[in-house]
């Protein structure tokens, strides 16, 4: 098994291994802006004890053109119906990252 932090980092950087959801506020932006926001999510590395107390790299926020952008990774079973019983096991877990305006 791999640790949750590594699985989350790999997913966040590649967007492979789960689903990425953009809220209405993000989708309303120009295509170029959405691409820039997605790139900032992929490159995010400002993890601190305050925003990452469990060292899972499952949440981040940054400013983009005067707006705060948040992203959060949640862990679901393979059918996306229930929360995963073991987020460190990719055999039983799908990741869902939601990117939104604060």
Report each predicted region and the residues it spans.
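Short, compact, well-ordered microdomains
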Residues: 58-102
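Compact soluble domain cores
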Residues: 2-62
